[in-house]
């Protein structure tokens, strides 16, 4: 059958149409592929528009299935380079840029000298000092142009967080104000697990960050001002990353915690954050503030040939030096102190930190703070033969060195030294060297960390400001630490940043167990909850069944608020519990007894004059030295080891002679001072009890007589009531005047510490040097209102009429 002729043309007609359709489909598919590629590229390399220009980040997956990916923006500039004329000056905002800036790699770190010999080992975590080779990889790229921050943004929403904007947590790294960088702490895990934006920052360190001449030439505190500038940048730009500028929490450990504490007291940071987490360090620690900045600046100037008499010329000379020459100078401060750190400049830090706390300068912030069980490990770790415990000689030397470096007054040292040894001797096991080692660690822990933290918590909570206190009692298993060590300084850091969830790293080379993973999840939940609501218990409950089949004991624990009366705190460990009055006896010793030891010293002198036994005759000890009535201690020398304790000098046991007598004398210990301490304390307590009972009896007897004479309240007229009130006010004023006169009369012969009023801060931070301590506002700056005086910097944005006269202090931010 033949095909119709017209149908022969159909294939020819449809061929162009098919070609056209295929071309359109191909173009559509190509466009779709390009679109998906762009979307994928945007997801892989997200771009954010800041106030200074666009930046490109990097989307990074995490090696744990329970953790979502995180967007990282690394090396974002928050200030102009502090170089040239900007050295030793407050930071300035960064310059804008065009195009898209790549922020996928870390920027340079601030100059520092990681030398084994120059590090303040006692104030640094073990994971820091034991990994200097690893740390060198983080700080190889050094430059004065170092004011950058790193931003870690989670990509998954939190069903518990009703606010579309995410809370922001800003970490201020530690390192004794001399070392460290925000680059070495990865905030990805904390950001992903807690659904918060985590930011780490670099700030100027050491000489470049804290040099001060004590006057207008170089005020100091540039590192603190860098942190404040970073917070200002965050307030302006974090909204572009999905962050909430009204929910910013700053947190830090060690020197970083002290910076956090100081920022809560500075008006320059007002409104830039709302909450603070202070881990193992406050502004009240002996190493938190440098009270002799001009002294160390002069030492530096001598070393580099800038010892000009005029401080302005000296600073100009230092400004023209190469930064490497400056940071390589070794300037060693007294133990427990710092050479370059925050100073009381009358501006950024307007007064002594304790005075500012007492005035309520930090009450507008919610605060969570705490300590680790064995913070003072590094102070004891260097003692010879500490693996087998601490010998009596080493114990005596450590206490003597401790007193000599912290308390600069010549009189009363013997009393203080013996009292400290008395308090930190386990009398039930006093001959055990391991027990002696444990109590020595406790001594340094209590003085340097626990007492300052409790004092800070008391001052913050006394008016009802939200305060939470913790004690960290866990640490990972690592070869970096001795087997006998407890949770030491900085041991909480890997748990805060979730390191156990991804396994050991070069910096935290621990053998993490499931318990470590569980505890890290618990800690991150507490920390991020506090950042979200100010309450570590809300909104996310403690639930770690996805990590550990065992029940999470933290589910049954509610972290209670801290108050000065109950002093409740959370014991963070594998057996959590809420307890009260953390190390109350030892804290009271440092906060209450030590500031008043000069009163007890007078009692000791009275007891010694009435019960003194005549000293032995010198002729009785032909080869020994007669013990003086007042025991004389060496200032820094280690007590000599007697021949009886030194095998190298042991003698024949059958040999007799004068040497045997010498050994016998030197191995004896005189407990007269301890006995005097005990008698004096007992006598003073008895005397106080007698006074209390006498006062109680007198008031009771007086009240009984007055009930017969006093008219009923209804018969008192208004004038009578007003008269009584006036008399009470006048009585209080007279008592205050007598109190002031008493304080003035004590100043002339005070040996240890004034009792009016008790000053815990300076008691802990007395300097041993001959140069007098800087009193608060000693280096307060010349007012800017003087003729020809230009404003020091652009940070002062507070108007003179901004403060309320109803606040506790003329410039207070106290919550009323």
Curated annotation (Swiss-Prot):
Topological region Cytoplasmic: 698-816
Keywords for this protein: Asperger syndrome, Autism, Autism spectrum disorder, Cell adhesion, Cell membrane, Disulfide bond, Glycoprotein, Membrane, Phosphoprotein, Postsynaptic cell membrane, Signal, Synapse, Transmembrane, Transmembrane helix
Related illness: Autism, X-linked 2: A complex multifactorial, pervasive developmental disorder characterized by impairments in reciprocal social interaction and communication, restricted and stereotyped patterns of interests and activities, and the presence of developmental abnormalities by 3 years of age. Most individuals with autism also manifest moderate intellectual disability.
The protein's assembly and partners: Homodimer. Interacts with NRXN1 in a calcium-dependent manner. Interaction with neurexins is mediated by heparan sulfate glycan modification on neurexin. Interacts through its C-terminus with DLG4/PSD-95 third PDZ domain.
PANTHER family on file: NEUROLIGIN
Family per similarity comment: Belongs to the type-B carboxylesterase/lipase family.
Protein name: Neuroligin-4, X-linked
């Amino acid at each position: 059958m033949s095909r119709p002729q017209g149908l022969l043309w159909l294939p020819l007609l449809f061929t162009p149409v098919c070609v056209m359709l295929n071309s359109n489909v191909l173009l559509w598919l190509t466009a779709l592929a390009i679109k998906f590629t762009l979307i994928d590229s945007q997801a892989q390399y997200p771009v954010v528009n800041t106030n200074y220009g666009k930046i490109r980040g990097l989307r990074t997956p995490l090696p744990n299935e329970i953790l979502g990916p995180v967007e990282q923006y690394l090396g974002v500039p928050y200030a102009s380079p502090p170089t040239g004329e900007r050295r030793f000056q407050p930071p300035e905002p960064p310059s804008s840029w065009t195009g898209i800036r790549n922020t996928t790699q870390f920027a340079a770190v601030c100059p520092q000298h990681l030398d084994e010999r120059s590090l303040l080992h006692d104030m640094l975590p073990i994971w820091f000092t034991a990994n200097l080779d690893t740390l060198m990889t983080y700080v190889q790229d050094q430059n004065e142009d170092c004011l950058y921050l790193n931003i870690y943004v989670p990509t998954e929403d939190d069903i518990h967080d009703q606010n579309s904007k995410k809370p922001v947590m800003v970490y201020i790294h530690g390192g004794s104000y001399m070392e460290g960088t925000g680059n070495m702490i990865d905030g990805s895990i904390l950001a992903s697990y807690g659904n918060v934006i985590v930011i780490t920052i670099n700030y100027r360190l050491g000489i470049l960050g804290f040099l001060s001449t004590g006057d207008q030439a170089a005020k100091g505190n540039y590192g603190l001002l860098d942190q404040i500038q970073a917070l200002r940048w965050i307030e302006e730009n974090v909204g572009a990353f999905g962050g909430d500028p009204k929910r910013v929490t700053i947190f830090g450990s060690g020197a970083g915690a002290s910076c956090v504490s100081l920022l809560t007291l500075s008006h320059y940071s007002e409104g830039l954050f709302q909450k603070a987490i202070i881990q193992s360090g406050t502004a009240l620690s002996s190493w938190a503030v440098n009270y002799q900045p001009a002294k160390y600046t002069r030492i530096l100037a001598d070393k580099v040939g800038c010892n000009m008499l005029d401080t302005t010329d000296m600073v100009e000379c230092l400004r023209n030096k190469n930064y490497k020459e400056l940071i390589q100078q070794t300037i060693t401060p007294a133990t427990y102190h710092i050479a370059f750190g925050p100073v009381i400049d009358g501006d950024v830090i307007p007064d002594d930190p304790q005075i500012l706390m007492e005035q309520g300068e930090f009450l507008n912030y919610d605060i969570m703070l705490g300590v680790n069980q064995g913070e003072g490990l590094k102070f004891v770790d260097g003692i010879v033969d500490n693996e087998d415990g601490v010998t009596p000689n080493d114990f005596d030397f450590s206490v003597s060195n401790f007193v000599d470096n912290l308390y600069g007054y010549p009189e009363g040292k013997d009393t203080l030294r013996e009292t400290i040894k008395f308090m930190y001797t386990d009398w039930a096991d006093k001959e055990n060297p391991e027990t002696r080692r444990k109590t020595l660690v406790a001594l340094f822990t209590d003085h340097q960390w626990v007492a300052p933290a409790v004092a800070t918590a008391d001052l913050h909570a006394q008016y009802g400001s939200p305060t939470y206190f913790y004690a960290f009692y866990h640490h990972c298993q690592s070869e970096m630490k001795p087997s006998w060590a407890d949770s030491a300084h900085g041991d909480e850091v890997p748990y805060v940043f979730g390191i156990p969830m991804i396994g050991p790293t070069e910096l935290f080379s621990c053998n993490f167990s499931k318990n470590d993973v569980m505890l890290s999840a618990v800690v991150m939940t507490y920390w991020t909850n506090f950042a979200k609501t100010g309450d570590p218990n809300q909104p996310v409950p403690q639930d770690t069944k996805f990590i550990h089949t065992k029940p999470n004991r933290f589910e049954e624990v509610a972290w209670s608020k801290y108050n000065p009366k109950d002093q409740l705190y959370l014991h963070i460990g594998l057996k959590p519990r809420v307890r009260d009055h953390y190390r109350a006896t030892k804290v009271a010793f440092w906060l209450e007894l030590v500031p008043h030891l000069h009163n007890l010293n007078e009692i000791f002198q009275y007891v010694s004059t009435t019960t003194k036994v005549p000293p032995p005759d010198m002729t009785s000890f032909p080869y020994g030295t007669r013990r003086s009535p007042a025991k004389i201690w060496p200032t820094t020398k280690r007590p000599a080891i007697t021949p009886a304790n030194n095998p190298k000098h042991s003698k024949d046991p059958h040999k007799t002679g004068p040497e045997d007598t010498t050994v016998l004398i030197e191995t004896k210990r005189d407990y007269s001072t301890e006995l005097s301490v005990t008698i004096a304390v007992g006598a003073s307590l008895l005397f106080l009890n007698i006074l209390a009972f006498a006062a109680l009896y007198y008031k009771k007897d007086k009240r009984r007589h007055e009930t017969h004479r006093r008219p009923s309240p209804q018969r008192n007229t208004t004038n009578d009531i007003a008269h009584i009130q006036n008399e009470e006010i006048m009585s209080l004023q007279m008592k205050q005047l007598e109190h002031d006169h008493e304080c003035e009369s004590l100043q002339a012969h005070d040996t240890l510490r004034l009792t009016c009023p008790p000053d815990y801060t300076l008691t802990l931070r007395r300097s041993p040097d001959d140069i007098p301590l800087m009193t608060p506002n000693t280096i307060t700056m010349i007012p800017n209102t003087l003729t020809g005086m230009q404003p020091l910097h652009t940070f002062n944005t507070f108007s003179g009429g901004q403060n309320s006269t109803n606040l506790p202090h003329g410039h207070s931010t106290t919550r009323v």
